[in-house]
Amino acid sequence: MRKRFTAGLLAFALAFTAMDFGGLVSIQANAAGLVQVTEENQSNFHLNGDYAGYYAIADKEDLQAFAAKVNAGEKDINAVLTADIDMTGEDWTPIGDTNDGYTGTFDGNGHKISKLVCERTGDKQVSGLFAQLMENSVVKNLGMEDGVFTSSTSTAGAVAAKSSLGK
């Protein structure tokens, strides 16, 4: 009897996993934990507009992963916020650097980043969400609230410490 039950359970499990759930869409995260928006999964993020190719940022871990990608050399990637983000308890390192700043589009999508703390000390240490926005970079539809931005020797700003004709 036990063998028959186990065989039946196994058959049910195999049949269930082979079913097509046409309405469900899988979302693939990359190694950094970020999810890239595609035409197929865009509706899962409740986005208005075409954000295919953008990285969806829903929480502080996503924002940190996005910053890490940019700081590792991917200066032209795009991002869209899908929720308000509370950065309480995090010591922020700006996105990009002053030698080779951010060149992509960062769309806040009407959301805000709150309690971002970026206190920088040392020679030429800038403070802000972004270190430097380069020509043709875009930051839009973004609110900043209750942040602290200090630099002992250089510039500080909530969105960007420096801008080279960004929009």
Give residue spans per PLM region.
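Surface-exposed repetitive/solenoidal architectures
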Residues: 27-167
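Intrinsically disordered, low-complexity repeat segments enriched in small/polar residues
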Residues: 6-9, 30
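Positively charged n-region of N-terminal signal peptides that target proteins for export
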Residues: 1-5
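Hydrophobic core
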Residues: 10, 14-18
